[in-house]
Amino acid sequence: HLGSGEEAGVERLAQSLQICLEKTADLGVKIALENTCAQGTCLGGPFWHIGKVLQKLQNPRLVVCFDSCHAHAAGHDLGENLEGVLSDFDAQIGLENLAVIHFNDGKGALGKHLDRHEHIGEGQLGKAALRGLLNHPKTRDLPFILETPEVETQIAKNIAAVRELRAV
């Protein structure tokens, strides 16, 4: 949406998704919209971008994927304000639309728009923020997908870290 503004970008995204939904109507597949780091002209950092698309299209095949690193990078403080972040998400998007969580730590500082995933508990989000998200009554029963670096060699380490966070 370069040069057109956020509203125009959201409108164009909704139009494109409507075409995708129409062309795949017989397949019954769902499309998950994922929050972004709000890098440059990318849509999806502010929750209202996704909320506006869902509101415009009103299609049950559209769901939302919440990425913990992306939220942190976009400035949503999961450590100090998880309740506020979830409340804002609910107001802008609706928690009923949340289908899955990409679970990862992040290398960048809060609000720096850096899309660099990190091993669980080793990044700038930290264990307390991740523990809060993993165990929160509004999110704990959702599917969590690990999206950490070096999956081939580090998956066991990250699974162990998640188990430790879940046990507390």
Predicted regions and their residues:
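Active-site-proximal loop/turn and secondary-structure-junction residues that shape catalytic pockets
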Residues: H1-S4, N35-Q39, S68-H70, D105-K107, ...
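Residue-level preference for long, well-ordered alpha-helices that form the structural scaffold
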Residues: E6-G9, L13, L78, L82, ...
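Alpha-helical scaffolding segments of alpha/beta enzyme cores, especially the outer helices
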Residues: R12-E22, W48-K56, G84-A91, A128-G132, ...
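Conserved, mostly hydrophobic/aromatic
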Residues: I31, D67, I101, F144
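A short, acidic, flexible beta-alpha connecting loop/helix-capping segment that sits on the rim
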Residues: I145-Q154
